[in-house]
């Protein structure tokens, strides 16, 4: 799994504070920077709509299609995914679940099955079967890449659900990596979630 921050809102925390203060007829001097206490108190009160003015775009690579099936359920976001209809999938990479990987017998069978699927996929496409039809035999473990754009409010909702210990392991790993990146970029907005889900995992330079 690889996660890359492609783009994000410049001066997002100042923009968010200004949006928060306009609700009360006020404004803020951008030269002074964002007021951490003010923003975090407003978030604690549940007034999160101003967070929608901040946006992050991530490039996510080498994850399973099982993961992306879960990811796209978070609907207040924009997604663009590698297409198995147009892209060749011969010699596809795949994710091996830890529960299978730790058992050598299961792991060997898993790898052999993926090789058989790859061989059949290659045979079908070389025999004239269209990729859009040959792809039906590909496993959920197959690597895929996806771009994701979420506003800060939706990101916070995503992190609360998917960083939780009850979330499925692969999307939990993704969510934690995205949170690490989000916190390093915007510590005021994401500090509370970092402290809950990542503080004991590793430290982030901010």
Located regions from the model:
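Family-specific signature for flavin-dependent thymidylate synthase
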Residues: 1-206
């Amino acid at each position: 799994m690889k996660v890359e921050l492609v783009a994000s809102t410049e001066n997002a925390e100042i923009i968010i504070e200004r949006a928060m203060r306009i609700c009360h007829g006020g404004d803020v001097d951008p030269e002074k920077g964002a007021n951490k206490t003010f923003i975090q108190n407003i978030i604690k009160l549940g007034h999160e709509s101003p967070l929608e003015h901040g946006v992050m775009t991530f490039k996510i690579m080498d994850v399973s299609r099982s993961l992306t099936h879960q990811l796209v359920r978070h609907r207040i976001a924009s997604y663009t995914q590698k297409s198995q209809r147009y892209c060749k999938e011969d010699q596809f990479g795949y994710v091996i679940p830890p529960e299978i990987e730790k058992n050598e017998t299961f792991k060997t069978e898993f790898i052999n099955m993926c090789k058989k699927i790859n061989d059949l996929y290659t045979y079908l496409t070389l025999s004239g079967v269209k990729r859009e039809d040959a792809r039906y035999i590909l496993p959920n473990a197959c690597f895929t890449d996806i771009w994701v754009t979420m506003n800060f409010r939706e990101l916070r909702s995503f992190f609360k659900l998917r960083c939780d210990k009850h979330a499925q392991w692969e999307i939990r790993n993704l969510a934690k990596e995205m949170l690490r990146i989000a916190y390093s970029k915007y510590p005021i907005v994401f500090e509370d979630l970092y402290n809950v889900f990542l503080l004991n995992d590793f430290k982030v330079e901010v």
